């Protein structure tokens, strides 16, 4: 239980406390420099020689001393107040600092026994950093206590707030680099304080680290006036506190006092909200920490300023192997931290350092919140079949495919009121998931006006997170998952590209965690629904037509990626149920929100989705015979058009043997040697044959199917139709025609590919061409598709 702050006995450092804190800080700085430079002689027990230096110097020094300065002062508060606190570092290239503190706390040696708190362990600890066969240069999954790698900048603050949601006893201290603060995602994520409820959530303490420089340029926020900077953060809704200077003897006391004040304010805000005394949105505290970049490092090198300059960003001296003067300067730098006072004869931190470290799970490097799979509780999932649509016969009835999903998510929220959230950029209702508002609301701690009561669904305790920033939403959700909870992200398909790179980074995190870090427990999967899809963006036009997000996902590791394109509502329910049960994956579901034909009842949908791919017997007529052609589909709209083409062909050529294959799990198309969901060649051939033409109607860009299936035996006969970047304000059929995924073009393709139809099908082919012309002209004249298109049903 976190104790309440007594400002009178914690705000002031005693001389002994200050000495111990400064010693820890010196030790962390020594370890940070050692990781960048040393491969041997870790405690300088002999003069430094070239053979003690790594052949290739990699890493970043500039942010390390500031990060360790914050770390040790947070540790003091954790010990004194028994705080549940974790640390998120935006400058992930400052990993040497995080690793150093984890080693000093003993956590690193616990999870990596080869890096014990000994001279030999320290030598290994130094050598492995940014070294082949070792560890990376950022706060990777291998880093104890990390939930944020920080390689790609901009996401630290949204991750911090995501971790704090539904974690009422947690404080997340988040260091934002002043370079990172220039990114768009970070700039928006300051507004996360309008979504944090002090009555039920934890707290985030943002610490903007103004060390003044990026790689080779000054930072914007370090070059504006104090008053402008203060006004900026007051405008964001924070109460800023400033810690500024370069003299550790002074700044230790200022930092201790400032942190004590901030924690006191956090606890007061939470107490007022939880007692019902206040329902106003609070002004949360934040800290602006202005210290030199490369603090405590060499002041100058060759007459150039280094400490307090961009020159300290990475490796201040890269030529120590060949420059004896710089080698001596490095040794002097390392000895300036007085390592003989910090480590005992065995190489372990001295007792005075160990005495100020938090204990057990209270160590930031060992806090179970940062290994959220340990805390994860499986969702209590209702039976998705309770929300299934009735399907008396395949292709005879219509339903909005995502509306039943909204009803299912409503029940998920009802059964899991404190560890599941739905995320979306102002599109929950648009994507027809609004049934969730029957049991919850949208989180909103901004001002509310009377008109909001009429359908606004705003509340300070909702389970739906909506802000028009896909970056912020994705950051919230990633951290919510990494700290042991569950979520679901629904967005427009075309604008999922906004978070391309974030999803890419999360995939890397999951892959490394599964492949390299056995002490990280599985976390809930990142589930993304892409709706308002390319084929029904006829009202928004070309800018909203882009199915390429799934192309990005196919580039990521097969260990962590899954893509599903359910053809109807019941398949969507089955897929969603499966994804919400899974761990350590990125599950992408593509499903349109509009009214579509329904094909499978709940049980048939469950069977079909479990297989991921299969022959639709009711749409085929090749039973007991070899097919003349295989018509395949993947995606909802293209499945309808493929079925309509099948029906046309069967009406005009009753003797034509057609096999209809539908794909839900896109990775079933890959060989099983490349993806765990891939089909064996034998199973693939049994579905698609080894020598018959395959007309494949695909939701996305057609070349993606070729990429996945290029090694298959019958690839030469695989002809894929998909979106080809042709679109505008179109009717649904017109858009399909423009991209040749429509029923008429597909039927023509079959006539061209099946040898015995090339001559006898000539008249039908001409009729199909006329249909294309006539339907386009009708769309131009009436603005809609013909009734026989809009009302089409499976005729058999």
Curated annotation (Swiss-Prot):
One of its GO terms (molecular function) is aldehyde-lyase activity. Its EC number is 4.1.2.-. Its cofactor is thiamine diphosphate. This is Probable phosphoketolase. Keywords: Lyase, Thiamine pyrophosphate. The keyword Lyase applies. Belongs to the XFP family. HAMAP family: Phosphoketolase. One of its GO terms (biological process) is carbohydrate metabolic process. The keyword Amino-acid biosynthesis does not apply. It holds the Pfam family XFP_C. CDD domains: TPP_PK. Signal peptide: none annotated.
């Amino acid at each position: 239980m976190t104790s309440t702050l007594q400002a009178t006995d914690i705000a002031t450092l005693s001389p002994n406390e200050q000495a111990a804190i400064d010693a820890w800080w010196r030790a962390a700085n020594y370890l940070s420099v050692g990781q960048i430079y040393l491969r041997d002689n870790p405690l300088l027990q002999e003069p430094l020689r070239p053979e003690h230096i790594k052949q290739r110097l990699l890493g970043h020094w500039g942010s390390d001393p500031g990060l360790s300065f914050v770390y040790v002062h947070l540790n003091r508060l954790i010990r004194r107040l028994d705080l549940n606190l974790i640390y998120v570092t935006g400058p992930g290239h400052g990993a040497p600092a995080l690793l150093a503190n984890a080693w000093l706390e003993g956590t690193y040696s616990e999870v990596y026994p080869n890096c014990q708190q000994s001279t030999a362990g320290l030598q290994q600890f130094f050598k492995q950093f940014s070294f082949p066969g070792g560890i990376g240069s950022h706060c990777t999954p291998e880093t104890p206590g990390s939930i944020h790698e920080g390689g790609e900048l901009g996401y630290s603050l949204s991750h911090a707030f995501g971790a704090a949601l539904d974690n009422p006893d947690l404080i997340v201290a988040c260091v934002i680099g002043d370079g990172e603060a220039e990114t768009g995602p970070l700039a928006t994520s300051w507004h996360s304080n309008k979504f944090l409820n002090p009555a039920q959530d934890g707290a985030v303490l943002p610490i903007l680290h103004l060390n003044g420089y990026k790689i080779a340029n000054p930072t914007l926020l370090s070059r504006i006036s104090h008053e402008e900077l203060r006004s900026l953060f007051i405008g964001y809704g924070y109460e800023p506190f400033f810690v500024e200077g370069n003299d550790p003897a002074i700044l230790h006391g200022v930092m201790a006092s400032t942190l004590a004040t901030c924690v006191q304010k956090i606890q007061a805000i939470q107490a007022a909200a939880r007692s019902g005394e206040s329902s106003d949105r609070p002004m949360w505290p934040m800290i602006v920490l202005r210290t030199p970049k490369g603090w405590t490092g060499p002041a100058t090198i060759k007459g150039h300023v280094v400490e307090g300059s961009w020159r300290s960003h990475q490796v201040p001296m890269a030529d120590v192997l060949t420059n004896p003067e710089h080698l001596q300067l490095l040794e002097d730098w390392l000895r300036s931290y007085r390592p003989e006072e910090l480590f005992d004869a065995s190489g372990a931190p001295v007792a005075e350092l160990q005495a100020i470290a938090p204990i057990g799970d209270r160590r930031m490097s060992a806090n179970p919140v940062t290994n959220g799979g340990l805390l994860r509780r499986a969702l209590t999932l209702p039976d998705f079949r309770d929300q299934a649509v009735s399907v008396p016969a395949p292709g005879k009835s219509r339903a909005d495919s995502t509306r039943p999903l909204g009803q299912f998510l409503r029940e998920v929220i009802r059964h899991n009121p404190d560890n599941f959230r739905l995320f979306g950029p102002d599109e929950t209702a648009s994507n027809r998931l609004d049934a969730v508002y029957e049991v919850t609301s949208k989180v909103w701690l901004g001002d509310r006006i009377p008109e909001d009561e009429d359908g606004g669904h705003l509340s300070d305790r909702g389970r739906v997170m909506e802000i028009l920033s896909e970056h912020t939403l994705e950051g919230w959700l990633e951290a919510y998952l990494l700290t042991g909870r569950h979520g679901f992200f629904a967005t427009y398909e075309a604008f999922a590209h906004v978070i391309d790179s974030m999803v890419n980074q999360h995939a890397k995190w999951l892959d490394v965690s599964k492949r390299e870090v056995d002490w990280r427990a599985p976390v809930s999967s990142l589930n993304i629904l892409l709706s308002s899809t390319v084929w029904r963006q006829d009202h928004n036009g070309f800018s909203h037509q882009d199915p390429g997000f799934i192309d990005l996902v196919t580039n990521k590791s097969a260990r962590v990626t899954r893509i599903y394109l359910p053809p109807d509502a019941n398949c969507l329910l089955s897929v969603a149920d499966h994804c919400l049960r899974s761990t350590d994956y990125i599950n992408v579901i593509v499903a349109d929100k509009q009214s579509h034909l329904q094909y499978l009842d709940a049980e048939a949908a469950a069977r079909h989705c479990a297989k991921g791919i299969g022959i639709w017997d009711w749409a085929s007529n090749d039973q007991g015979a070899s097919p003349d052609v295989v018509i395949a589909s993947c995606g909802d709209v293209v499945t309808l058009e493929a079925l309509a083409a099948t029906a046309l062909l069967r009406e005009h050529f009753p003797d034509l043997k057609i096999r209809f294959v539908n794909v839900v799990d896109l990775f079933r198309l890959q060989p099983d040697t490349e993806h765990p969901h891939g089909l064996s060649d034998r199973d693939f051939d049994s579905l698609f044959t080894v020598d018959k033409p395959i007309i494949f109607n695909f939701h996305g860009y057609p070349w993606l199917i070729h990429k996945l299936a290029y090694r298959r035996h019958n690839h030469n006969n695989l002809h894929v139709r998909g979106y080809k970047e042709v679109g505008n304000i179109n009717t649904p059929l017109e858009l399909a025609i423009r991209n040749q995924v429509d029923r008429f073009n597909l039927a023509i393709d079959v006539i061209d590919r099946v040898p015995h139809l090339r001559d006898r099908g000539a008249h039908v082919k001409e009729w199909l061409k006329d249909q294309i012309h006539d339907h386009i002209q009708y769309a131009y004249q009436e603005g809609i598709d013909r009734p026989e298109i809009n009302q089409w049903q499976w005729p058999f």
